[in-house]
From Swiss-Prot:
It holds the Pfam family HHH_2. The keyword GTP-binding does not apply. The gene is ligA. Belongs to the NAD-dependent DNA ligase family. LigA subfamily. This is DNA ligase.
Length: 706
């Protein structure tokens, strides 16, 4: 079940159409994941350079296979969906991102493209504004009659988050515009950022108070702006540079340079390093100057932006997909340094992923002391042939996560041996397996691995699992730290152990007689649990709510399920000759190889089985309810939408599934029924557009009750 090492990615020119389709899907999913982490969670996990390389490969695939381009492709999108934590604001003019240039040649080609598009003669001048590219959070400010009325983040480019109240606390953002010639509607756009000095001071305060430490100034600025508590934003030293605009009822200027100067007169801070250039050579000289002075600047930048100066030419040039033709970002090369890799450590994440980390002889990269760097995964170690004791090149790009770029092989010590990636978890000793098609090796000790314990316990008591009232994330952390709940079974022995303990739970801060009695009662109320909930609670990789129900319905009882998995796990080592139990598992509709392998891997780890057996001594597992094949909705696809009054959404879903229906979260041509409650929205609209049958709650009940 473990996969072989992956080969380096083939050149795009070598891809067949079928391979390109698979590669395009992989790149789109990976880019979407990184967009969400960057734009929504303010917690990027790859460097700017690594992200840019994904974008470049996607663009190359789409250039060779243009039929793969869809409206959902990352090349057609900007940013990520706005967070649900904030109200949304629709941008009157989309907030698009910029195309990137990574070399002098690409900058020269940008200028040549502009000249060709505008049909400029060889001697006709082309003025271009150049300015540092601030590494912060894009923001749009809307003024009506000179007064600030709202502020929104970029979001997905078309719809952003309403952060008006928070933005009003930023000193660089005027509440009322100054001067004359102010348009009735004026949208000013720019970047929220934080000075490096302020970032370091903030992180020290965060550390002293035990709060979250930010990775870099960009993350701290984004996280500070996107606070639900306005007082927190007000306490953070946020700044704002204005450099662009959205909807304008009248234009105060005719050039980019004059517009930015008008922003300054209106009361905004603007970047004093903005200049006007007349040719490619001047652009590149400016780029070198800013690159040289980068470390001395008080704020982070990740490149230089070039914009055609004349606004009428900007209008003629227009846009292509997700970016304007009249502007481009000239990105800096990643900052690098050379040092010795002293040791490779393996860290185990909360999902069981084994991640290699390089421990380095301390080296300064871009003004920051680096002692650790990511090695990504075992394939990267093998591909670069990274060994302990090697002299390596370290790169920091975008101030995110340092990484090992390459090995200086002529400095390799004679005793250095190829690194052997562990096949067991360094924390708990369980098997570490790598699934087909994945780069990550994972610990299979789901129930017993300390590195995964807290997240597994939180999952175990979650709403779709044991759903124990009063035992949430906070309590799980507290009880784990106090060594009161280390494994699932400890939840159900907590009351018994507390009765004989010297330090009673009721004497702990935040607890008392009543709260402890209520907690123990809530735990006892969950000693009887449905089979599908138990299977879901085990936290087996790839086994979500839906697959847990499929497994429960197929095996019926916990005894049948355990016996079948024991047989399948026992025969696991017989390559090419799966047991009858494994074949039966794999044949369940909706399960397949990936889920089947994950379930068998779980039961192949003896300590998981031992932990489950201990748990079963404390609980009663109810047999699965059998699906009715003769009901009126058996085999039908149903969508519930709006506010239901006769039952909860979960009750409606469970009832429909017991009757053999498939419950979906979205409406499509394959949907048979949409059950619409009060205030039904877009799903109801789409159902009517597609001609899908729409039922009220009463009509639904009449249908299923015959």
């Amino acid at each position: 079940m473990a996969a072989k090492s992956k080969k380096p990615l083939p050149s795009v020119d070598q891809l067949t159409k079928a391979q390109a389709k698979v590669e395009h899907k992989r790149l789109a999913l990976e880019i979407a994941m990184h967009d969400e982490r960057y734009y929504q969670k303010d917690a990027p996990t790859v460097s700017d350079a690594a992200y840019d390389s994904l974008r470049q490969r996607l663009n190359a695939v789409e250039a060779r296979f243009p039929e793969l381009v869809t409206t959902d492709s990352p090349s057609q999108k900007v940013g990520a969906q706005p967070s649900r934590a904030f109200a949304k604001i629709r941008h009157a003019v989309p907030m698009l991102s910029l195309g990137n240039a990574f070399s002098d040649e690409e900058v020269a080609e940008f200028v040549a493209r502009v000249r060709r598009f505008l049909n400029l003669g060889a001697d006709e001048p082309l003025a271009v504004v150049a300015e540092p590219k601030i590494d912060g959070l894009s923001l749009s400010l809307r003024y009506e009659n000179g007064e600030l009325v709202n502020a929104a983040t970029r979001g997905d480019g078309f719809e952003g988050e309403d952060v008006t109240a928070n933005v009003r606390t930023i000193k660089d953002v005027p509440h009322k515009l100054k001067g004359k010639n102010i348009p009735a509607v004026c949208e000013v756009r720019g970047e929220v950022y934080m000075l490096r000095e302020d970032f370091l001071t903030l992180n020290k305060k965060q550390a002293d108070s035990g709060d979250t430490i930010f990775a870099n100034p960009r993350n701290s600025a984004a996280g500070s702006l996107r606070q639900k508590n306005v007082a927190i934003t007000a306490s953070r030293p946020l700044k704002f540079f204005a450099y662009a605009w959205g909807e304008m009822s009248a234009m105060p200027a005719t050039t980019q340079f004059e517009m930015v100067k008008w922003f300054e007169k209106a009361g905004f801070a603007v970047n004093p390093r903005m200049i006007l250039c007349r040719d490619v050579e001047a652009l590149l000289r400016y780029y070198r100057e800013i690159e040289t002075e980068r470390a001395q600047l008080s704020y982070d930048i990740d490149g230089v932006v070039y914009k055609v100066d004349r606004l009428d030419w900007q209008t003629r040039l227009g846009f292509v997909s997700r970016s304007p033709r009249w502007a481009i970002a000239h990105k800096f090369a990643a900052e690098q340094a050379t040092t010795v890799l002293e040791k490779i450590d393996i860290q185990v994440g909360r999902t069981g992923a084994l991640t290699p980390v390089a421990r380095l002889a301390a080296v300064t990269v871009g003004g920051v002391v680096v002692q650790n760097a990511t090695l990504h995964n075992e394939d990267e170690i093998a591909r670069k042939d990274i060994r302990e004791g090697d002299t390596v090149v370290i790169q920091r790009a975008g101030d995110v996560i340092p990484q090992v770029v390459s090995v200086v092989t002529d400095k390799r010590p004679k005793h250095a041996k190829p690194y052997s990636f562990p096949h067991v978890c360094p924390v708990c000793g369980s098997h570490a397996v790598r699934e087909e098609g994945e780069a990550v090796r994972r610990c299979t000790g789901a129930l017993i691995c300390p590195a995964q314990a807290v997240e597994r316990l939180k999952h175990f008591v979650s709403r779709l699992a044991f759903d124990i009232e009063g035992l949430g994330d906070k309590q799980i952390h507290e009880f784990y730290d106090a060594k009161l709940i280390m494994h699932p079974v400890d939840i159900f022995t907590l009351a018994k152990r507390d009765a004989h303990a010297t330090d009673k739970l009721k004497d702990r801060e935040g607890y008392g007689d009543v709260s402890v009695r209520n907690l123990f009662a809530a735990i006892d109320a969950r000693r009887r649990i449905e089979l599908n909930r138990l299977i879901f609670a085990l936290g087996i990789r790839h086994v979500g709510e839906g697959n847990a129900k499929l497994l429960a319905r197929h095996y019926g009882t916990i005894e049948n399920f355990r016996a079948a998995m024991a047989e399948a796990a026992a025969a696991q080592t017989e390559e090419g000759n799966p047991s009858e139990a494994y074949a039966d598992l794999n044949a369940i509709g909706g399960v397949g190889d990936i889920v089947a392998d994950a379930v068998v891997e779980f039961f192949a780890e003896e300590r998981n089985v031992k932990a489950l057996n201990e748990l079963l001594h404390e609980i009663e597992v109810l047999p699965a309810e059998q699906v009715r094949a003769d009901s009126a909705v058996a085999g039908k696809t149903v969508v519930f939408t709006g506010s239901l009054t006769k039952f909860t959404r979960e009750e409606a879903k469970a009832q429909a599934e017991r009757l053999g229906a498939k419950v979906s979260g979205s409406v499509s041509k394959k949907t048979d029924y949409v059950v619409a409650g009060e205030e039904a929205g877009s799903k109801l609209t789409k159902a009517r557009e597609l001609g899908v049958a729409v039922l009220t709650e009463d009509e639904w009940l009449k249908l299923i009750e015959g």
